[in-house]
Amino acid sequence: MRTTSTENQSTEEHFKVPSSKFEFKRWSGVQGCSRLEILSIVHHCASGDNPTAMEYRLLGGSGLKVSALSFGAATFGGGNEFFKAWGETDVAEASRLIDLCIDSGVNLFDTADGYSDGRSEEILGKALGKKRERVLISTKAYFPTGDGPNDRGTSRHHLRVALEASLQRLGTDHVDIYHMHGFDALTPIDEVQDSLNKFVREGKVNYIAASNFSGWHLMKSLAVADRYGWTRFVAHQVYYSLVGREYEWELMPLGIDQKVGALVWSPLGWGRLTGKIRRGQPLPEVSRLHKTADMGPQMADEYLYNVVDALDAIAGETGKTIPQVALNWLLQRPTVSSIILGARNEEQLKQNLGAIGWNLTAEQVAKLDKASEVTPVYPYWHQRNFPERNPLPV
């Protein structure tokens, strides 16, 4: 496990763990922030309750500040039937969405070489153009990019080829955050981490991150990097939503302990928390779930309806929409550095950007927690029987 140096101790005051909640103290020496209220790894700078004010949070244990709401380019391109269901955004529409994001304070744009066979990266690069230097770009490698035996995974060979191809498509000389889009059990971890460390030393990557790792995958990767003094993962891109809370069982405590920030993908539960799905009503014809439901997380209808009912009630109390309430709940969760928004049009994007600049009350958060709780699997149900010595993060 990573130890804390004396220098770090002088900068960051202690935090204590009461019965089942983490209580975090203010960081000394932090300028421009009224409070530190999410986690020790989240730098929360908000300007009151101004709905147009973006928050900027530290990305894990790094010094990089990312907007609390970021933009995901998986809707760009529509390269195959799966991605067409997500969106078919072209360069012109992408430019409008990006301008809206930048005007709203968004500084992080996420893509992957596997999105629409690289077309997403191409469109993002063209749409950003000269604005690229004003923002951060995150991309990923792991999924197949060709038919060859080495056109996939995270081997040294594939990562080198994949990174160079991504840089070319994006029209940039470096990637700000480079994710391993999945864990490659066939490649030694030291080979992966050594390759990523070299990319950072070469200036082609600034920060590295994981995505969709199990707890032991992430911890072993961090341990290998620490052993050799290599650059370590500062973030983990994860699926997390009101109807998908498994992240809280193992990965969230790991993120707290190791200062690994969460970049949340599909924060609206694979399209289920858009407000269009209601109890007793058929699935809307325009829903992408008709084509993608079998590839995403599964859940019982009654569970989903209970969560939507709770969201609907709180939306009525706050004057917000169901997606805005669902996103605001996530913004208050431990370890969350940024929520990646996906949108096919400006109306969707504007609505989602309205999740910032206000907060649900503790009572409203508790109501959503209750409606969305699920029975944990082993060993987590056993651990929760005695939280005194192993407190829960939420």
Regions found by a protein language model. Give the residues of each.
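Short, basic, low-complexity termini and linkers enriched in Ser/Thr/Gly/Pro
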Residues: 1, 10-42, 46
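N-terminal binding-site loop/beta-alpha segment at the start of enzyme catalytic domains
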Residues: 39-135, 201
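Terminal-tail/helix-coil boundary detector
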Residues: 45-54, 95, 257, 281-317, ...
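Conserved, mostly hydrophobic/aromatic
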Residues: 59, 71, 94, 109, ...
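Short, well-ordered coil/turn segments that N-cap beta-strands
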Residues: 66-69, 105-107, 132-135, 172-176, ...
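Active-site beta-loop-alpha junctions enriched in small/polar residues
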Residues: 74, 112-114, 140-144, 180-183, ...
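Glycine/proline-rich, positively charged
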Residues: 80, 146-250
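Aromatic-lined glycan-binding groove of carbohydrate-active enzymes
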Residues: 247-286, 321
